[in-house]
Swiss-Prot record:
Residues recorded with modification N6-acetyllysine: K13, K29, K108, K128
Subcellular location: Secreted, Extracellular space, Extracellular matrix; Cytoplasm; Secreted
Modified residues (Phosphoserine): S30
Name assigned to this protein: Galectin-1
GO terms assigned for molecular function: lactose binding; laminin binding
Residues holding a beta-D-galactoside: H45, F46, N47, P48, R49, H53, N62, W69, G70, A71, E72
Length: 135
């Protein structure tokens, strides 16, 4: 899946929140947000799948360490609708990342890379970024 946005040197620290708002395509199959050190070292691969890779209305999360993917974690909460504008907030600490979905539901994903700062973000798929903010 090609990335539509790549940002580096973010220097997001523990406790800070990355807020991403964008528009889901009307015919969306899936989209992704990646956070980490770089493309080969991701503490979070966030991949809502409407109908892709055998998953329907499922959020698939993973990490990548030195280019090797970890074990996938699936979330059943799926507040995304094709054609809608959504906002996702992600914060982290030494132990895990907290993802707050558009409906207010939150889940945690382990900080498997033990990153002390998030410097890289990429986004892609059927999602058009409207705003990125740091809180």
């Amino acid at each position: 899946m090609a990335c539509g946005l790549v940002a580096s040197n973010l220097n997001l620290k523990p406790g800070e929140c990355l807020r991403v708002r964008g528009e889901v395509a009307p015919d969306a199959k899936s989209f992704l947000l990646n956070l980490g050190k770089d493309d080969n070292n991701l503490c979070l691969h966030f991949n809502p799948r409407f109908n892709a890779h055998g998953d329907i209305n499922t959020i698939v999360c993973n990490s990548k360490d030195g280019g090797a993917w970890g074990a996938e974690q699936r979330e059943v909460a799926f507040p995304f609708q094709p054609g809608s504008v959504v906002e996702v907030c992600i914060s982290f600490n030494q132990a895990d990342l907290t993802v707050k979905l558009p409906d207010g539901h939150e889940f945690k994903f382990p900080n498997r890379l033990n990153l002390e700062a998030i410097n890289y973000m990429s986004a892609g798929g059927d999602f058009k970024i409207k705003c990125v903010a740091f809180d």
